[in-house]
Structures are given as C-alpha cells and as structure tokens.
Design a protein with these regions (language model features):
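Ligand-site clamp/hinge motif
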Residues: 201-204, 229-274
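Aromatic- and charge-enriched surface segment that lines or borders ligand/interaction sites
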Residues: 76-128, 313-315
C-alpha cells in the first residue's frame, strides 16, 4: 500500500549527501525471475523490467513538480487551453537524440502513430488517448493521418498542438492518461515497417534516447550498459558508466551482503533477510500504487459502456460496507506479514498529490465498536 505521507516513518528517502565527483562506474541490480524483454521504446513496451532497465536514457518530455503537476523546464513544455480544448507542446531547442539529431514535432506525432497503428500491436492504445481528435479514425484505418495533431511550424518544427474532444480535470497532471508524455525518433525508425518495429534492432539493440545516458552495450535479456549522452540538453551527467544487470529474487540477500552491486531494489518480503546488512544505506521508495477493497453493487453494461447500479445488491448498503471496513485489522496484518513496511492510506488520492489530498479524511481504522453500531 502507498503512504498518505511523502515519507516512510522507518526509512530515509535519500542517501547522505556528499560532494559530487565526475566519473565512476555504477552497477545496478535488476531483480526479476525472467530475462528482460528488451523492448526499449515507450510506445511498445509493457514490461516494468524494461522500463527499469531503460530509465537512464528514457526521460519524460515534460517536467513536473513534487505533486506531479506539469511545470516548465523539461525537454518540452506543455500549455493546456481548456476553452480551445487544446494542449500546446513546445520542444526545447537544445534537445537532441543520442545520435545528435534534434527532437522535432514529427517525433511526437510519430509516437502517437506507433501507439495507434494496429500493425505495431502496441498495448498502449486506450480510450483515454482516443480522446485526441482523429486518433480513433487512424487506429481503425479510416484515416492515414491523425487530424487532431497540428504542427504549425511543420514536421521539423518544435511546436505541436493537440486537439481534444473533451477536456479532463487531470490533464494538468503527469500520468493523466489523455496526453502521451514521450517521443520516438522518426528520422531513425521511419524506414522500419510498423509490423517489424517491435523486433527491430533499432528498438532492441541500438535504441536512441534524448535523456542523460545512451546505450553502449546490450546483452539481450541480461544486462544493459549506459554511457553519457554527449548531446544531453542539461549537460554531461557525472557518472562514466551505468550497468544494469538481471538477478533473481533469490539472489538479492546474498548480493547485498557481499556488496556485489551499488544499487539494488528490495521488495518488502525480502526485508527480514537483509535488514542487518552492513555498509548499506536503505532508503524508502514509496510508489503511487495501492491496494483497495471493492464491493459489487451492480454490473458493467458493455453495450452502453457504463456501470449499472443494482439497488437490491447485498452490498448496496453503506452501513454494511462501513462495518466491514471497521472490522478489518489492516494494521496488524501489515505488521505481521510485511514487517510493518506496508500501511493504510485514508483516501484514494495520497498526499503526494498536494492540494488534491484531503487531510481531513481519516479512513477506517480497526474499531469493532463502530462496526457493531
């Protein structure tokens, strides 16, 4: 479960600060039961392990503040116009791909084409993205272009205007699902047919990124080595090399105790086996994902695309639902089965979202008396 705080009560969220030095190699353990897929493209990848491996070069287009709201200063800036039903993306002129070519408007449009073209078999296409005018028609093969993507200065310009059918409240926040937040190198991939893209070496072995690091070597399914991207728009990064290598969950404890890697992800279940390790800084990584209890109070009408409430459903009784919530000793379960690393949140919107979090909501703690009432 996620925390309603932006920090964990038992852990720091950063390592001790020291003077930054240039150079040095960092080894990172990627914990997984299976080899990573190696699809190094946001529009085609659906594997969390691939995302973890390519994070060193794969930078989001838009900068955000600590509540995930879009702000200026990223590879591109975004401006939402609710009245015009548009989002205007302005690309930073300093941004270049790792081969030295500039990031341009067509690269952003091309990302949408990869997602929506059925030949790519991308799993990123959603009804939320289809809120973009013309994306559904392109997806269905009724149009060869996406009418809702406008490039005022042409394909090689740095401005893109997205036209939407409807505006949504979450469009000012990263991860809203209605606005794609990555680009794809059209100049590099345009000669690869859409149906061959996912298996191409330009995706699997020699991908391009505009982030701080670029790929230097891929051992398929096992490791990826990264070196500084000399074209990075924010300047040369400090590390000389980063190597991300796969290890199995069973190997985590021993690798930490033997200092085999500089950085290792540790799951809650592994904590009892490694909490006594010496010479290691443990820091908290609080995700935005959480688990919740749901009640069946109706059914999904696929034809209408909507939920239909059933007033006679057993669980369509607020008092009954509250009684169940008060009768669940969640804190004790977490203490017993997650070493106290998991904990409750009082509301669906955690504190990380700033003003959107309602600090007055207390949630449901274990309280048999209230449950019986």
């Amino acid at each position: 479960s996620n925390s309603n705080n932006t920090s964990h009560p038992n852990f720091k969220e950063s390592t001790p600060k020291k003077t930054i030095k240039d150079g040095g190699n960092v080894s990172v353990a990627v914990v997984t039961d299976t080899p990573f897929t190696g699809i190094f493209n946001d529009e085609l990848s659906t594997n969390n392990t691939d995302s973890e491996v390519m994070q060193y070069g794969d930078e989001s287009l838009f900068a955000t503040n600590n509540t995930y709201k879009y702000v200026k200063g990223g590879a591109a800036d975004i401006k939402i116009n609710k009245d015009a039903k548009t989002a205007t993306i302005t690309i930073n002129p300093k941004v270049k791909w790792s081969d030295g070519q500039p990031l341009v408007a067509k690269d952003y449009e091309y990302a949408y084409e990869i997602i929506a073209n059925k030949a790519t078999h991308s799993q990123r296409y959603t009804s939320s993205l289809a809120n973009l005018v013309g994306l559904e028609e392109y997806h269905d093969g009724k149009s060869n272009t996406i009418s809702g993507i406008e490039m005022p200065d042409g394909e090689n310009g740095r401005t893109v205007v997205l036209h939407f059918k409807e505006m949504k409240p979450g469009m000012t926040q990263s991860g809203n699902g209605y606005i794609w937040e990555a680009a794809a190198p059209y100049h590099y991939l345009k000669d690869v047919p859409f149906d061959k893209l996912i298996s191409s070496n330009k995706i699997r072995k020699n991908p391009l990124f505009y982030g701080p690091y670029k790929v230097s070597k891929v051992v398929r399914g096992q490791s990826v080595s990264w070196v500084p991207n000399e074209h990075y728009y924010k300047g040369k990064p400090h590390l000389k090399k980063i190597t991300a290598s796969v290890i199995t969950p069973a190997s985590v404890a021993q690798s930490i105790k033997s200092n085999k890697f500089d950085v290792t992800q540790v799951s809650n279940s592994q904590w009892p086996n490694i909490k006594g390790a010496k010479g290691v800084n443990f820091i908290a990584n609080i995700p935005l994902a959480y688990s919740y209890l749901g009640f069946k109070v109706g059914k999904w009408d696929a034809a209408k695309g909507e939920n239909v409430m059933n007033k006679d459903a057993k669980m369509n009784n607020r008092s009954l639902r509250q009684a169940i919530a008060y009768g669940m000793n969640v804190d004790q379960v977490y203490k017993r089965y997650s070493s106290g690393l998991s904990f409750r949140i009082p509301t669906l919107i955690p504190k990380q979202f700033g003003d959107y979090f309602d600090k007055n909501v207390k949630g449901y703690t274990y309280n048999i008396k209230k449950g019986n009432e």
